[in-house]
Amino acid sequence: VGSAPEAGFYQAPTLLRDVPATHRLAREEVFGPVLAAMPFTDEADAVRLANGTLYGLAAGVWTRDGGRQMRMARAIRAGQVFINNYGAGGGVELPFGGMRHSGHGREKGFEALYGFTTLKTVAIRHG
């Protein structure tokens, strides 16, 4: 990977496994190359854990079951849900943004225009 610059704070890519649901890493948004992997018992438990935080920027689901992919994508309260990948896509045509404490509104995509415009209806009767 190379060496980190001497100034600033840098974290090497890190996977933390068996993180308890009550741990700070499971409850806050961690920006950086850090993944907190948490054990779960079934699909409902996984959704409960994913939604058990005040934040909702992004989530990742790994499963081959197409029905489960769609159920979890609908049930998880996050602005983005990645299925069997993480961070793939996300071009300028796709809206980006979070839910709850992760922010309001959207960047990118047609949806982002709503934050910069005001809609108005003008009705004119001629004649």
Residue ranges and their predicted role:
Residues 3, 10-127:
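Conserved C-terminal structural/oligomerization subdomain of aldehyde/semialdehyde dehydrogenase
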